[in-house]
Amino acid sequence: MRYYLGIDGGGTKTDAALCDEFGRIAARTLGPAGNLVDIGISAYAALLGQLLDGLAQQTGGSLPPVAAAFAGLSGGSDPQIAADCRLLLRNRLPDTPLVAGGDDRQSLLAGGLYGADGCVLISGTGCACTARVNGQQHSIGGWGFLFDGKGGGFDIGRDAVMAALRAYDGRGEPTRLLPLLEAELGCGIEQALPGLYREGKRRIASLAPLVFSAAQEGDAAASGILDENMRELALWLDTAAKYFSGSFPTVVAGGILMKSDDALRRLCGFVKSDTCPARMAMAPVFGAVVAAMLLDGVSEQRLRGMDFSL
């Protein structure tokens, strides 16, 4: 029996799974955020050990021989980060012949398109887009929270705080976001700011669901925030269309687009190119498992027949 390891590390959590050659799940475990840029190599090494130990506990105390392993990380498009990830994996899995680490978009391209051409769009804590054409990958957006202003949970949460502050100090119109945020944060919006600065991206991204709630109540500011962010993601897909000669498949992933029908509806309404964004059918961690299987030469036909179940 051949086994494959996949790891999906995002801005909120890290998911690891071990599957056999038929796609049956042998073990699965969760850990904290796994963006190597944010947590650093030492913390990621400790996290990797925690994940592999958690998997081993579910397989009799030790991992079976692993034919191939792939770790897809938020921030893994940086060649040095990808190299660090591979080294850490190889150190922990010295007998595994095929080990690779890279961008979490590679996991989604594998799990959503099985190595075929198309586009993947992520909107989670952060956001990113990649077009794959004739084996070549082209990045659109996804340059990090300092340089990409719209599209992810952090952006939506930050925009909500900004709208609430404008309502609070009189620069903006009243918005339901102000009382919703104050209730969530447990204090006035001004008093909440030091804590938000300390807690950073993940805490701010966690406020994004309040924007969807306010938009459902008819709040104009909240609806405007969602439109601005989904319009930016639509622009990314329209930019990706330049790499294709006609229609192309698009797979979407990440908490914003996977959990919110409103977000996906708005996105589809703004897209001008010939593509129909569809949610990824499997969890991203199984996309990482598929990426590992592709390393080992498993065919697209076999992969499409797997449902990754217990």
Language-model features and meaning:
Residues 1, 97-120, 136:
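Conserved phosphate-binding catalytic cores of ATP/NTP-utilizing and phosphoryl-transfer enzymes
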Residues 1-64, 91-92, 112-119, 162-310:
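ATP-binding/phosphotransfer module of carbohydrate and carboxylate kinases, centering on a glycine-rich
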Residues 8, 104, 124:
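Active-site glycine-centered loops adjacent to acidic/histidine catalytic or metal-binding residues
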Residues 27-30, 100, 138:
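Structural signal for short hydrophobic segments within the conserved structured cores
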Residues 53-93, 98-100, 112-113:
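Short beta-strand-loop/turn "lid" adjacent to the catalytic site in phosphate-handling enzymes
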Residues 70-77, 123-125, 248-259:
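Glycine-rich beta-strand-to-loop/alpha-helix junction loops that act as flexible
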Residues 78-79, 107-109, 128-129, 257-260:
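Short, active-site-adjacent cap segments at secondary-structure transitions
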Residues 116-167, 171:
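Glycine-rich phosphate-binding loop of actin/hexokinase-like ATP-binding domains
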